[in-house]
Amino acid sequence: MIRRVLVANRGEIALRIVRACRDMNIDMVAVHSEADADGLWATMATRRVCIGPARAGESYLSIPNIIEAALKTGCDAVHPGFGFLSENPDFARKVAENGLIFIGPGADVMARMGDKSAARAAMTEAGVPVVPGSEGVVDSIEAA
């Protein structure tokens, strides 16, 4: 059972996740940059952790900082929210490698579905109807 979740996002996305977890009696850890310390999602969470400076590349996109925050605060799971690292298979893999639950699709699924050609092939193989289009990677403008 999940007892504590770290939300690896900010703003209204993080706020929505914080509220949902609160409704389910799950402790919530919010991460924030130095500039976002007073963000509503951070103040409403059970705990909050600063993960770096205002620049997103040094905070919200820093996989090591987010993993460290989750481990230091005793989280069971990480919710990526939307954008930032939510579709990054390396992030999902690192979360799992550190013994945490990634709330979202697995790294392998993300990697496969993130490649349109591979996703189309997987859906066709599974018998899912796909819209007409190329059967593989288009290698020239003329072919497109």
Predicted segments with their positions:
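N-terminal beta-alpha lobe that positions the nucleotide/phosphoryl donor
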Residues: 1-144
